[in-house]
């Protein structure tokens, strides 16, 4: 790679700061790489697909108030695909297109990945942030995919071994197929 790009050894952590996903860092980095190969950065981004690795709140039967059971994820039922996220209605949200949801669904099913869909809870019950919205703003197809977590953000969180393994399989098949 060009030496100017080789010097860039930063990692995007959440959304804050000059290397976060809410900065211009990723866009500039992709534009630099694309230019070296003779492409436009916006064309590379517009033809990209992304899985945003993010957990989802699993339905908690001992504290079901913030959940809508029919739209929740559950532990031991596979990796969770979250079509939309956000809080306060549509604030801080990302909403994957139906076509991209279908692409991800077909990819997982055709490769034996156990998956489920789920929301993060009732509207305005708290939570729901995602970094996927920053990727989506670059015109990249993106959807949140991750492990359902029981008692998220509590002192004792629980995840399932099978869900974790299915998340591994989902990301592996995404990068290899």
Predicted regions and their residues:
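A glycine-rich phosphate-binding loop feature that marks nucleotide/adenosyl-phosphate handling sites
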Residues: 10, 46-56, 121-130
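His/Asp/Glu-rich mid-to-C-terminal helical/loop segments that flank catalytic regions of hydrolases
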Residues: 147-177
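Single conserved hydrophobic/aromatic residue that forms the stacking wall/gate
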Residues: 1-13
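Flexible, glycine/charged-enriched surface loops at secondary-structure junctions
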Residues: 7, 37-47, 108-122
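Non-transmembrane, aqueous-exposed alpha-helical and coiled segments at domain scale
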Residues: 16-21, 34, 67, 93, ...
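A glycine- and small/hydrophobic-rich beta-loop-beta segment
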Residues: 23-82
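Short acidic, glycine/serine/threonine-rich loops at helix termini
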Residues: 15-20, 61-65, 156-158
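Active-site-adjacent substrate-binding region
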Residues: 62-63, 67-154
């Amino acid at each position: 790679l060009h030496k100017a790009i080789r010097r860039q050894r930063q990692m995007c952590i959440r959304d804050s700061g000059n290397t976060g996903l809410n900065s211009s860092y990723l866009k500039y980095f992709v534009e630099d790489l694309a230019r070296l190969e003779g492409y436009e950065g916006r064309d590379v981004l517009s033809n990209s697909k992304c899985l945003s690795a993010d957990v989802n709140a699993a339905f908690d039967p001992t504290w079901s108030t913030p959940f809508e059971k029919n739209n929740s994820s559950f532990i031991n039922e596979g990796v969770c695909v979250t079509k939309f996220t956000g809080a306060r209605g549509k604030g801080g949200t990302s909403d994957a297109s139906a076509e991209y949801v279908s692409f991800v669904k077909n990819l997982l099913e055709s490769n034996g990945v156990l998956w489920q869909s789920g929301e993060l809870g009732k509207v305005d019950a708290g939570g729901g942030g995602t970094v996927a919205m920053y990727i989506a703003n670059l015109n990249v197809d993106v959807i949140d995919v991750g492990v359902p977590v029981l008692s998220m953000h509590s002192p004792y969180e629980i995840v399932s071994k099978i869900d974790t393994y299915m998340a591994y399989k989902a990301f592996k098949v995404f990068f290899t197929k």
